[in-house]
């Protein structure tokens, strides 16, 4: 066993003595040591209940004849961190999470790991660590929260609350109505109820094969979550016995399938960023061109909030992720069905009994929302290395208009609230990329303000930052290269005409090459916004969005 490094031989007597101080007995040294990587934190509703989950996981691991050791990672609630300096820490927290898991697991030579994530950066951070460490691992997430209902019976979620702010600002609703939405938007523990980043990543974790069937859609408060926990411990023991590791599971084909589900569900644009980072950790050469190829062959089968009024509980009721995959498998060339997963079985075996139970929620191949996926990669002179749009969350497929330029999210939000943006404008928020932000903050507050003011289909928004999974409308993010790296978005000037063509996958500014070259020669890189601390180091080391915004390792001569 891997853990023999710290428990076998006369020279490990000090190690065993320390372990006995934690409560271990001599007989425990013949059992696998299992890391329980939890992310319990009280300020995040998606993680508030994970302390109890950790206890259940440890019980299940002991029942399976193994020895559990629980530890916790940090976490950032993107909703609470939204709209202020806290959002700069969100994406960088992914790297701290991955590094902290790597540190604990490799320092103590565990034989296997069960990860308990749930929200936005915690799930991909743990997945990155699992691929880096490469010991048998199973994920069991905290699960989605249910959607809420206002006193009038209106179904609401966190997206409704953000958009309610814009609606109140523009006089469309009263303060009492906003308070009603606020009070009911997040009714329980769990990850926010729509197809936002947290749920998108937990669904993708299931498809990749690191989590068990049901992981993506079973609600946090559903008793079936406890059964999933028991299964996770049992399956982990099988993975250890068969020496099946994350890099055996997360192959190029598995990533294809993850993006295929993402396209079928119109998931968060953040999945592109995180899954590219996973590919980096797995040592795979996977780029945005391959994502675009997946998008072209996968139909959009279900729309979940913010693209519709359906929520994760509806997906679960309609058959869950397995039902979507089963329907997708009817189209040749969409899925790789014979690859291994954390169940110890193939994807084909995992979904064999699944079926769609509500075709209003999950559409059939014969009746898709669109013939192509709900996410698309755009390129052009504004995004040489690519940009991402959640095409399934807007009915507008072509938009052209003059730029209204802001050099930060705060500046943009203030401008929107002051009425500086009007119908037909293209709002540009730049210097908010991985390096420029730093931390590539999400633009949920500006997009929600635009939508809440009734301009969602009348105004486009471009950024080198990110969008929350709760964002909708004509929102193009992840523009690469970013402004701080001298990308074309830095060269835009007020009033430049920008064209967004979703069908042609095009993002262009109507300015001549000669003029752009002239502007490039005159451009000067702004001073970094942060020069000290973690964010200062992050800004110096982070790579572009099109490579997952991972950290580059400095090379020394």
Swiss-Prot record:
The active site is at 468 (proton acceptor). The keyword Flavoprotein does not apply. PROSITE patterns: ILVD_EDD_1, ILVD_EDD_2. Its EC number is 4.2.1.9. One of its GO terms (biological process) is L-valine biosynthetic process. Keywords: 2Fe-2S, Amino-acid biosynthesis, Branched-chain amino acid biosynthesis, Iron, Iron-sulfur, Lyase, Magnesium, Metal-binding. It catalyses: (2R)-2,3-dihydroxy-3-methylbutanoate = 3-methyl-2-oxobutanoate + H2O; (2R,3R)-2,3-dihydroxy-3-methylpentanoate = (S)-3-methyl-2-oxopentanoate + H2O. It comes from the Bacteria. One of its GO terms (cellular component) is cytosol. One of its GO terms (molecular function) is dihydroxy-acid dehydratase activity. [2Fe-2S] cluster binds at residues 119, 192. The modification N6-carboxylysine is found at residue 121. Binds 1 [2Fe-2S] cluster per subunit. This cluster acts as a Lewis acid cofactor. Its cofactor is [2Fe-2S] cluster; Mg(2+). Mg(2+) binds at residues 78, 120-121, 442. Pathway: Amino-acid biosynthesis; L-isoleucine biosynthesis; L-isoleucine from 2-oxobutanoate: step 3/4; Amino-acid biosynthesis; L-valine biosynthesis; L-valine from pyruvate: step 3/4. Belongs to the IlvD/Edd family. NCBIfam families: ilvD, PRK00911.1. Homodimer. Functions in the biosynthesis of branched-chain amino acids. Catalyzes the dehydration of (2R,3R)-2,3-dihydroxy-3-methylpentanoate (2,3-dihydroxy-3-methylvalerate) into 2-oxo-3-methylpentanoate (2-oxo-3-methylvalerate) and of (2R)-2,3-dihydroxy-3-methylbutanoate (2,3-dihydroxyisovalerate) into 2-oxo-3-methylbutanoate (2-oxoisovalerate), the penultimate precursor to L-isoleucine and L-valine, respectively. This is Dihydroxy-acid dehydratase. It comes from Bacillus cereus (strain ATCC 14579 / DSM 31 / CCUG 7414 / JCM 2152 / NBRC 15305 / NCIMB 9373 / NCTC 2599 / NRRL B-3711). The gene is ilvD.
């Amino acid at each position: 066993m891997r853990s023999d490094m710290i428990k076998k031989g006369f020279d490990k007597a000090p190690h065993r003595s320390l372990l006995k101080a934690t409560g271990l007995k001599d007989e425990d040294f013949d059992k696998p040591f299992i890391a329980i990587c939890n992310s319990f934190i009280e300020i995040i509703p998606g993680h508030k209940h994970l302390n109890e989950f950790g206890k259940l996981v440890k019980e299940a691991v002991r029942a399976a004849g193994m020895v559990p050791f629980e530890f916790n990672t940090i976490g950032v609630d993107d909703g609470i961190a939204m709209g202020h300096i806290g959002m700069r820490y969100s994406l960088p927290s992914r790297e701290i999470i991955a590094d902290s898991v790597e540190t604990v697991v490799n320092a103590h030579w565990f034989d296997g790991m069960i990860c308990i994530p749930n929200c936005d950066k915690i799930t991909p951070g743990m997945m990155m660590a699992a691929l880096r460490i490469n010991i048998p691992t199973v994920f069991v997430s905290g699960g989605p929260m249910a959607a809420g209902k206002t006193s009038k019976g209106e179904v609401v979620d966190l997206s409704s609350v953000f958009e309610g702010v814009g609606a109140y600002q523009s006089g469309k609703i009263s303060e009492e109505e906003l308070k009603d939405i606020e009070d009911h938007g997040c009714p329980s523990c769990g990850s926010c109820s729509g197809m936002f980043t947290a749920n998108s990543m937990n669904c993708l974790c299931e498809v990749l094969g690191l989590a068990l069937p049901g992981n993506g859609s079973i609600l946090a408060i559903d008793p079936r979550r406890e059964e999933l926990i028991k299964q996770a411990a049992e399956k982990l023991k099988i993975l250890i016995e068969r020496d099946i590791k994350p890099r055996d599971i997360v192959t190029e084909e598995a990533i294809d399938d993850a993006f295929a589900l993402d396209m079928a569900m119109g998931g968060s644009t953040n999945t592109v960023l995180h899954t590219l980072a996973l590919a980096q950790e797995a040592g795979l050469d996977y780029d945005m061109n391959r994502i675009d190829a997946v998008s072209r062959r996968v139909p959009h089968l279900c729309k979940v909030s913010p693209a519709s009024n359906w929520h994760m509980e509806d997906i679960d009721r309609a058959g869950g992720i397995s039902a979507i995959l089963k329907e997708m498998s009817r189209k040749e060339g969409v899925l790789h069905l014979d690859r291994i997963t954390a169940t110890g079985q193939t994807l084909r075996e995992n979904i064999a009994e699944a079926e769609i139970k509500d075709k209003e929620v999950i559409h059939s191949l014969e009746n898709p929302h669109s013939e192509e996926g709900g996410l698309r990669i755009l390129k052009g002179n504004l995004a040489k290395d690519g940009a991402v749009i959640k095409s399934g969350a807007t009915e507008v497929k072509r938009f052209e208009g003059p730029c209204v330029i802001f050099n930060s999210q705060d500046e943009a939000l203030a401008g929107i609230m002051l009425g500086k943006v009007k119908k037909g404008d293209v709002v540009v928020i730049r210097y908010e990329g991985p390096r420029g932000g730093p931390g590539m903050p999400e633009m949920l507050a500006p997009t929600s303000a635009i939508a809440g003011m009734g301009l969602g289909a009348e105004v486009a928004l471009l950024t080198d930052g990110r969008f929350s999974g709760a964002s909708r409308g004509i929102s193009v993010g992840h523009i690469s290269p970013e402004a701080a790296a001298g990308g074309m978005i830095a060269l835009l000037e007020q009033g430049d005409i920008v064209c967004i063509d979703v069908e042609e996958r095009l993002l262009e500014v109507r300015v001549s090459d000669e003029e752009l070259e002239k502007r490039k020669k005159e451009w000067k890189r702004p001073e970094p916004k942060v020069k000290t601390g973690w964010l200062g180091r992050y800004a110096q080391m982070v790579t572009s969005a099109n490579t997952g915004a991972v950290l580059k390792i400095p090379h020394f001569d």
